[in-house]
Amino acid sequence: IDYRDQKNNARAGGYYSVTWRRYADLDFDLYNFREIDAVVQQFFPIFDKKRVFAVQGRLMATTADDGQQVPFYFQPTVGGSTSLRSYNDFRFRDETGVYFNFEYRWEAFSALDMALFYDLGSVTPEVDDLRLSNLKDGYGIGFRFNTYKSVLYRIDIGFGGADGVRYFFKFSKAF
């Protein structure tokens, strides 16, 4: 379900998605597994659409069939420019991953939005192992060079993680 006011620089509305996949290893019969990926994004305009409180939550879970395993490159990861910005890309990896992003965005001037963000995330072997107390967190500031309808370039600077200060330079929106 997608009712954001605009896809590439949302200032109001929401996006909700659940994807389920089944992977079958036809060559070696070692890597048969299922994957679910659920994403929730909500954008709350404050007074006008020049200030926005944006929230994202994502749950990724893989389950291997009996006697099978999930290849490491298909395991959910947390850390990096789209999840936990105070940690390196792919910093945490396991069978289940969850993260939450909170951003306060405002228009500094017509071609530049700024953002303050707070991220939480974790990975675990099983969905049942997810605990709020195990979530890693970080915070930071972001700069989005944009047109009204699209983010052209963004710079995010993340603090608070064990990996030190992280800088991300991307030609894409955060979420």
Task: Name the predicted role of every residue range.
Residues 41-42, 139, 162:
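Core subunits and conserved enzymes of cellular information-processing
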Residues 33-35, 95-97, 136, 148, ...:
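Membrane-spanning beta-strands of outer-membrane beta-barrel proteins
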Residues 15-17, 52-56, 101, 113-117, ...:
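Residue-level detector of the transmembrane beta-barrel scaffold of outer-membrane proteins
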Residues 5-9, 47-51, 110-114, 145-155:
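Repeated loop/turn-to-beta-strand initiation elements of outer-membrane beta-barrel proteins
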Residues 143-147, 164-175:
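Outer-membrane beta-barrel "beta-signal"
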Residues 105-136:
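C-terminal hydrophobic structural anchor segments
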